[in-house]
């Protein structure tokens, strides 16, 4: 689960991580009020920041600096309601419905900090770079040595000696080292206690008056840990998520929308990824990742089918099932129900193996629906790609 920057900063503030003063607003009038309050309280200006679940907002025109209350209001009026397009939103962009109005700060240096789970090592890794304010992937590609890494023992946490090592490698002033150690340890405590899978501060800044701040905040949370954090679960903004993905989550389905034309329904994440690979190998592009899971029932399969077909880009469907816990006859019943209810006109290719496969094939045959049967994954991929391209 992702959250907005203003929500992330509220969490950081709770854990003692310094963030600029600011407030989320949804109207021009609110923006002017917050800007007025901040400037009366010593701010030299304010930053008007679009709040969407995507990076690259500055380049897309979603982050602007205002030197006066009137200018803050004008900028808020322009940004609110705009469709912001960045390298992470896709060409369709995202509509801006809220803003963060924040004080400007006397920035001296922009750096980068993040904590993410390193699955290969089975522990969190604290990453830092002197190249802040940039896409960290670009920095790593140009110079891998520019990324400082410290692996953290979960049972111990981020040691002060590790934080000091990072601070020295970043070239921080001696008078900032102690402050930086506290900042980094508070950041790790935030990551650990919220069950986050990613906390990213880009940029992490030093100011001309020797203070440290998180100028931006990005959080990803492990969905499997949200039951322990009802307060975090309430921060979810479904308007920022794909409607089909939101609908799928209601039925316990793992669905991710992609840009292709071949709809996929598979049981098991590994088989689903292999199916997507073989579709591309056959010259097609998958329209989605859809894992119905091992314990799906006929009703869930029906919902999965309806969600898959709701994507207008889908030109053909591949159902690739290896029956284990999810029996093939259960899958077949759900597919027939969904195909009958939706009066589907698209080609459907099925590759079925495993538990109760003969019963499943019998259900499909008796349905009277026109399915294309494939014996192997290669055969299935070739048939569905041809069908998506209109080749008979």
UniProtKB/Swiss-Prot annotation:
Among Gene3D superfamilies, the record links this protein to: ATP-grasp fold, A domain, ATP-grasp fold, B domain, Succinyl-CoA synthetase domains
InterPro entries membership? ATP-grasp (IPR011761), ATP-grasp_succ-CoA_synth-type (IPR013650), ATP_grasp_subdomain_1 (IPR013815), Succ-CoA_synthase_bsu_CS (IPR017866), SUCC_ACL_C (IPR005811), Succ_CoA_ligase-like_bsu (IPR005809), Succinyl-CoA_synth-like (IPR016102)
Q: Which cofactor does it need?
A: Mg(2+)
Give the record's GO CC terms: cytosol; succinate-CoA ligase complex
Decide whether keyword Iron is in the record. no
Q: How is the cofactor bound?
A: Binds 1 Mg(2+) ion per subunit.
| ATP-grasp domain sequence ranges | 9-247
> Is rRNA processing found in the keyword set?
no
The UniProt record gives the binding positions of ATP as 49, 56-58, 102, 105, 110
Query: Superkingdom of this entry's organism?
Result: Bacteria
Biological processes annotated in GO: succinyl-CoA metabolic process; tricarboxylic acid cycle
Question: Where does this protein act, in terms of pathway?
Answer: Carbohydrate metabolism; tricarboxylic acid cycle; succinate from succinyl-CoA (ligase route): step 1/1
Q: Name one Pfam family in it.
A: ATP-grasp_2
Q: What is its EC number?
A: 6.2.1.5
Q: What class of enzyme is it?
A: ligase
Residues holding Mg(2+): 202, 216
Entry keyword set: ATP-binding, Ligase, Magnesium, Metal-binding, Nucleotide-binding, Tricarboxylic acid cycle
Please name the GO terms that the record assigns under molecular function.
Answer: ATP binding; magnesium ion binding; succinate-CoA ligase (ADP-forming) activity; succinate-CoA ligase (GDP-forming) activity
The catalysed reaction is: succinate + ATP + CoA = succinyl-CoA + ADP + phosphate; GTP + succinate + CoA = succinyl-CoA + GDP + phosphate
Q: Which residues bind substrate?
A: 267, 324-326
Q: How does it assemble?
A: Heterotetramer of two alpha and two beta subunits.
Record family assignment: Belongs to the succinate/malate CoA ligase beta subunit family.
Query: What does the record give as the function of this protein?
Result: Succinyl-CoA synthetase functions in the citric acid cycle (TCA), coupling the hydrolysis of succinyl-CoA to the synthesis of either ATP or GTP and thus represents the only step of substrate-level phosphorylation in the TCA. The beta subunit provides nucleotide specificity of the enzyme and binds the substrate succinate, while the binding sites for coenzyme A and phosphate are found in the alpha subunit.
Q: Which PANTHER family does the entry mention?
A: SUCCINATE--COA LIGASE [GDP-FORMING] SUBUNIT BETA, MITOCHONDRIAL, SUCCINYL-COA SYNTHETASE BETA CHAIN
**What's the protein here called?**
Succinate--CoA ligase [ADP-forming] subunit beta
Q: What is the lineage of its organism?
A: Bacteria, Pseudomonadati, Acidobacteriota, Terriglobia, Terriglobales
